[in-house]
């Protein structure tokens, strides 16, 4: 199974570099994969040395230049833990020649890590993925197969129009049994989009008047409800710090002050940790 995936992956790399492989090329790739396995060849450049010149030359870009170390390692050092995060914005901005091989590899690692344990796959800023043809098709596939691996798919986007305008909107709508809507004062202006997501005008009004960063509107097969996490000022000082400027400030404080960054960050918010000792946040 791994060899079949590797064969398809190499075929994709060649296609991205304007080499249309025929049966002879694929047979050669498969033979060389077997030979590389038998001889414990792990690096891409060593594997390429086994190939015919036209195949080897097409793959040169993946072992040279500033990105040449991405695929040409002696061993795979990517370790997945019970909580793994990948920053996709930079990868998706690299262009298909680089982004696609990386995505295919990450997809493979994620899927192999799903062995039936309860899992949650979160796609934050999903508009980036919905706008990418390969990622979009992978999302379509995940909707249908991840549940068999006991994995739930969670997609988040700041703009619901990106989801509605996606070519896989029918799949997104039919396969997401639970939807959580953030407060949106402009909801009335795009009521038609909300109605495409199954909401009525009363529900749109609730979203338009909900309190930002405090209330959320949930719809599911079991019913609908406006709810709040009831976070106090201490919890909000951290849970509400999600914008890039705040995250960067926190990282700078941690780098400069170590564990003391917590107190300094709270002071910038007019709060003191001592005031909350022994109390709920």
Task: Give the predicted meaning of each segment.
Residues 1-151, 155, 164-167, 203, ...:
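P-loop NTPase motor domains
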Residues 160-281:
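C-terminal regions of RecA-like/P-loop NTPase motor modules
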